[in-house]
């Protein structure tokens, strides 16, 4: 079982796992079981089968990566699918600005979801949603950043 954070981050419910197959998969399991609430965040030290784009696996080692997924409930927002256009790129731009502001590191974006540093892939963003009758029911945003990863599959 995960450790549940004792404090919330602006209303986020945070669950931390030492090891998990995938933070994204855990969000979807909770969604399927109807045990998830808006602004639920799943964080893991180690992912054994993290999800990348195009069915790729996103590997994470302990203390060498940042891996988390966040669930947003849109069921009461009447949000059309087209309103999510560009969401992944906006998230990527925000990550780039955070790294610049906090660490004075210049990062690049490889459209639409990859983050690069000095020509090497540093991380990525996976945005998934459930849509019903043209309206977004929920959005799950997964972010993986390699901070000190040495070995890659």
Kindly give the residue locations of the regions a language model identified.
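Short glycine- and Lys/Arg-enriched binding-loop motifs that mark or flank ligand-binding interfaces
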Residues: 46-51, 115, 138-140
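Short, acidic (Asp/Glu-rich) active-site segment that either coordinates a divalent metal cofactor
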Residues: 134-153
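Short beta-strand segments
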Residues: 43-45, 69, 110, 126-128, ...
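Short, glycine/acidic-enriched loop or turn micro-motifs at the edges of active sites
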Residues: 21, 48, 117, 145-147
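Acidic (Asp/Glu) carboxylate-rich active-site/surface patches
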Residues: 92-134, 144
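N-terminal lobe of the biotin/lipoate ligase/transferase fold
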Residues: 1-101
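Structural motif
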Residues: 13, 39-41, 66, 108, ...
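Short coil/turn motifs at secondary-structure junctions
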Residues: 73-75, 130-132, 148-150
């Amino acid at each position: 079982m995960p450790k549940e954070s004792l404090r919330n981050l602006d209303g986020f419910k945070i669950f931390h796992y030492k090891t998990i197959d995938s933070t994204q998969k855990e969000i979807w399991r909770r969604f399927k079981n109807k045990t998830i609430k808006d602004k639920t965040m799943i964080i893991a030290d180690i992912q054994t089968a993290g999800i990348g784009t195009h069915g790729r696996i996103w590997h994470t080692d302990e203390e060498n990566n940042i891996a988390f997924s966040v669930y947003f409930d849109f069921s009461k927002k009447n949000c059309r699918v087209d309103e999510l256009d560009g969401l992944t790129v906006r998230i990527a731009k925000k990550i780039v600005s955070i790294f610049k502001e906090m660490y004075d590191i210049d990062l690049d974006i490889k459209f639409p979801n990859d983050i690069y540093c000095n020509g090497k892939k540093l991380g990525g963003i996976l945005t998934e949603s459930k849509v019903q009758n043209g309206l977004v029911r929920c959005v799950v945003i997964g972010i993986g950043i390699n901070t000190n990863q040495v070995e890659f599959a």
